[in-house]
């Protein structure tokens, strides 16, 4: 306390209040057993992990067609598109099936469904709706 008074030139009463205040903040951080028992366990609130905010489908405009590579044991070229959704988000959507006709500014319908071996792809484009045609059947 004398150190505070000498170095900062404050009164004895202010120095004792400063020490008491710092002590209270250090002790006040922990809850007592009775307080923890009363309030129950502390549960963290995590942000929701829903890519389309709980909606099953969303319409979007294609910004760019992409080819993504899967994670380690698999090897392929997964056809994807970068889509600006009607919710305002920009996300990557996978195009299922063989071949597609998508270009920039086309409109697609996206559903929730992640691609397990490609990180960051949480949507799939729906074939046969808007500008994304059905899979063309091969002639034998």
UniProtKB/Swiss-Prot annotation:
Pfam family, one: Ribosom_S12_S23
Subcellular localization(s) per the UniProt record: Mitochondrion
Chief place of localization: mitochondrion
Record carries keyword Lipid biosynthesis: no
Gene Ontology process terms (BP): courtship behavior; male courtship behavior; mechanosensory behavior; mitochondrial translation; response to hypoxia; response to mechanical stimulus; sensory perception of sound; translation
Transit peptide: 1-30
Gene3D superfamilies (UniProt xref): Nucleic acid-binding proteins
Keywords: Mitochondrion, Ribonucleoprotein, Ribosomal protein, Transit peptide
Protein name: Small ribosomal subunit protein uS12m
Organism for this UniProt entry: Drosophila melanogaster
Higher taxonomy: Eukaryota, Metazoa, Ecdysozoa, Arthropoda, Hexapoda
Encoding gene per record: tko
């Amino acid at each position: 306390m004398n150190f505070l008074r000498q170095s900062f030139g404050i009164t004895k009463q202010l120095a004792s209040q400063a020490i008491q205040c710092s002590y209270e903040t250090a002790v006040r951080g922990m809850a007592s057993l009775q307080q923890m028992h009363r309030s129950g366990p502390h549960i963290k609130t995590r942000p929701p992990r829903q890519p389309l905010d709980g909606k099953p489908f969303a319409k979007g405009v294609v910004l760019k067609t992409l080819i993504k590579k899967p994670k380690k044991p698999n090897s392929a070229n997964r056809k994807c598109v970068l889509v600006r959704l009607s919710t305002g988000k920009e996300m990557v959507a996978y195009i299922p099936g063989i071949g597609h006709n998508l270009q920039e500014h086309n409109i697609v319908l996206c559903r929730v469904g992640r691609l397990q071996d490609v990180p960051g792809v949480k949507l799939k484009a729906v074939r046969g709706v808007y500008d994304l045609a059905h899979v063309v059947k091969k002639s034998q």
